[in-house]
């Protein structure tokens, strides 16, 4: 393999390598579990020459054979060192990490890791294997090799193996942070390759896709010009363009041609080729040029992604912190500390309960609001009263006639029958009792639901404590609902006593009369003058009496409905919020008296401890990941380009 100049390498050590190392370190910390990291994913159909390209880049033999050879995503991390005699390998997967110093062991180590991850055979796994190679003969580069796309399942493979592989590939190529390195043989129709089609589906403009043409020595005579056109980006356009390489073929492998010898052969092939020599001269050919191109692209992509990556880490940290706050700290083991912890839990719940029922912010969660729903229910109650008033007005004329016939006794015509007035008022008020009780039931259910939600977010991970809180909420709900129902029924019994202050009633009556006069003035006058309320024209003087009765009924209903519009919600709020919250607080405080029962109430859900541990691990990963990003953000991409052009 051609070696990069020492100056180039020195600049890597100072600037480029830290950039790539930062992303590699984030990946090793497990940050990729939380968000996507900049990467180069290598994809290709089976037998596309993908493994040969990676072998040539890394300088070590990788697993080969027919069918699916790459059965797990393989992170190939190459670190260039100044020490010409040093070669070191490290393979990591699951909880295993192994160092070795013989490059010949790479293939065996990868196969062992794949067997452990995906099982012996030909299955695949989505778990990542990481292979780190430190050598003077490799570029500073990190690639992720993905399984080759299979068209037909072979013996021992599930029928949907092709779909499994494509699903795995899509996990990587859909990410905006991924550069798609698509490997395509020169001797096939590039437009029909599934690897390029998948990349185009997720990256239609080709901004994240780089094409690699392999096996130029197998091109049919007469088609070389098409290959040149593809590399020149004149057939299927990719923003990042194309490169062309020639790696060891199967015969050369069997003849034990070394990778260094293969690189020399590749260089000679392109220099002397009648059609491809200009690609060599233009810098589009050979593995060393590909390594340089990939390094430039990766560093560019990393630098471009850094601001967004920093923002994502900050967002994820905030989300993690919020989740940790929701789960809270686990209970301490020391008895006195456990009691203090329990007291704090109950006190915080009681304070949040008070805040919830008075419309203040709840500390344990930001989206638990009670009063907006109560306001809606009470608005519905007010609407019921308005509709009842409208229907009352419509039936007044008919009902007054009926009451006059049925109840008017010795009074002379023209006198208002107070008994008729009271009867009509009472009948209308009775119709409102059932809707009021329904409003009570609805609000009671809303309050119960909110109280339970508060308990759930206050006692996350403590099932026994949550259970007893729910039991108390249910009991108090039934009790206070029953008391509120009794108060409402009493209220409606009192409403059957027709009463209002003289001043209040007189004002309401005057308002009703003024409104009626305005309506009559606006009504078109008939050519033949008729009484103002023709429906009351009974051929007697009773129409004046009935007109007065109608005004009195409307006036009183207005007063009664306003009274009920406020009184019913006040009774409900008093019993279901204020009294229920106070009783629940007292009940919860009584738990503190049973010190022997504290341990049982603080038994934590087995899953919660694990979730808290996972969140703490994520928080640690993300915090550690932010430290090197700050420095890299200070270095602009122009700095990197200047280095690479030296």
From Swiss-Prot:
GO terms for cellular component: cytoplasm; microtubule; nucleus; plasma membrane; presynapse; synapse. GO terms for biological process: defense response to virus; receptor internalization; response to arsenic-containing substance; response to bacterium; response to virus; synaptic vesicle budding from presynaptic endocytic zone membrane. Residues 44-51 are annotated as: G1 motif. Residues 546-637 form the GED domain. Pfam families: Dynamin_M, Dynamin_N, GED. Induction: By interferons. Residues 69-71 are annotated as: G2 motif. Keywords: Cytoplasm, GTP-binding, Nucleotide-binding. One of its GO terms (molecular function) is GTP binding. InterPro entries: Dynamin, Dynamin_GTPase, Dynamin_GTPase_CS, Dynamin_N, Dynamin_stalk, G_DYNAMIN_dom, GED, GED_dom. Belongs to the TRAFAC class dynamin-like GTPase superfamily. Dynamin/Fzo/YdjA family. This is Interferon-induced GTP-binding protein MxA. It comes from Danio rerio.
């Amino acid at each position: 393999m051609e070696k990069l100049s020492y100056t180039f390498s020195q600049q890597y050590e100072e600037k480029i390598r830290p950039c790539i190392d930062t992303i590699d370190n984030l990946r090793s910390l497990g940050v990729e579990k939380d968000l996507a990291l900049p990467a180069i994913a290598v994809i290709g159909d089976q037998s596309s020459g993908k493994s040969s390209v990676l072998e040539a880049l890394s300088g070590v033999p990788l697993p080969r054979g027919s069918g699916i050879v790459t059965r797990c995503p393989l992170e190939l991390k190459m670190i260039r060192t100044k020490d010409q005699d040093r070669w070191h390998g490290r393979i990591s997967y699951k909880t295993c990490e192994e160092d070795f110093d013989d490059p010949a062991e790479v293939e065996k180590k990868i196969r062992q890791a794949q067997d452990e991850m995906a099982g012996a055979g030909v299955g695949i796994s989505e778990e990542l294997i990481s292979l780190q190679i430190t050598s003077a003969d490799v570029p500073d580069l990190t690639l992720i090799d993905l399984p080759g796309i299979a068209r037909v399942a072979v013996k021992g493979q599930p029928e949907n193996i092709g779909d499994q592989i494509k699903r795995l590939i899509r996990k990587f190529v859909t990410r905006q942070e991924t550069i798609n390195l698509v490997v395509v043989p020169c001797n096939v129709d590039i437009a029909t390759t599934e690897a390029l089609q998948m990349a185009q589906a997720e990256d239609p403009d080709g901004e994240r896709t780089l094409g690699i043409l392999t096996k130029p020595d197998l091109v049919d005579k007469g088609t070389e010009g098409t290959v040149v056109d593809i590399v020149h980006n004149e057939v299927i356009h990719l923003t990042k363009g194309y490169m062309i390489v020639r790696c060891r073929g199967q015969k050369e492998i069997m003849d034990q041609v070394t990778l260094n010898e293969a690189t020399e052969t590749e260089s000679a092939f392109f220099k002397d080729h009648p059609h491809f020599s200009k690609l060599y001269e233009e810098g589009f050919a050979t593995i060393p040029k590909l390594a340089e191109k990939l390094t430039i692209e990766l560093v560019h992509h990393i630098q471009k992604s850094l601001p967004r990556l920093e923002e994502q880490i900050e967002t994820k940290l905030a989300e993690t912190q919020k989740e940790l706050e929701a789960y809270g700290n686990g209970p301490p083991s020391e008895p006195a500390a456990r009691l203090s912890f329990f007291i704090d839990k109950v006190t915080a719940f009681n304070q949040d309960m008070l805040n919830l029922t008075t419309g203040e912010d709840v500390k344990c969660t930001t989206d638990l609001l009670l009063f907006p729903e109560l306001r809606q229910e009470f608005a519905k109650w007010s609407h019921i009263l308005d509709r009842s008033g409208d229907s009352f007005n419509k039936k007044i004329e008919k009902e007054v006639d009926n009451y006059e016939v049925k109840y008017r006794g010795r009074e002379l015509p023209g006198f208002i029958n107070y008994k008729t007035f009271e009867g009509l008022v009472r009948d209308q008020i009775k119709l409102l009792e059932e809707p009021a009780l329904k409003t009570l039931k609805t609000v009671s259910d809303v309050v119960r639901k909110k109280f339970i939600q508060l308990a759930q977010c206050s006692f996350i991970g403590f099932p026994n404590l949550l259970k007893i809180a729910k039991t108390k909420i249910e009991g108090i709900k039934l009790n206070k609902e029953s008391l509120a129902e009794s108060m409402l029924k009493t209220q409606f019994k009192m409403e059957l006593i027709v009463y209002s202050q003289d001043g209040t009633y007189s004002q309401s009556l005057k308002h009703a009369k003024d409104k009626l006069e305005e309506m009559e003035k606006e009504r078109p006058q008939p050519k033949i003058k008729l009484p103002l309320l023709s429906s009351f024209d009974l051929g007697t003087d009773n129409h004046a009496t009935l007109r007065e009765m109608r005004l009195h009924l409307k006036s009183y209903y207005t007063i009664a409905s306003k009274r009920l519009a406020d009184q019913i919600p006040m009774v409900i709020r008093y019993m279901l919020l204020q009294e229920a919250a106070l009783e629940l607080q007292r009940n919860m405080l009584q738990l503190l008296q049973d010190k022997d029962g504290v341990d049982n109430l603080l038994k934590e859900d087995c899953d919660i401890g694990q979730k808290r541990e996972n969140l703490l691990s994520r928080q640690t990963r993300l915090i550690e990941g932010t430290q090197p990003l700050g420095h890299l953000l200070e270095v602009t991409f122009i700095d990197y380009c200047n280095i690479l052009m030296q």
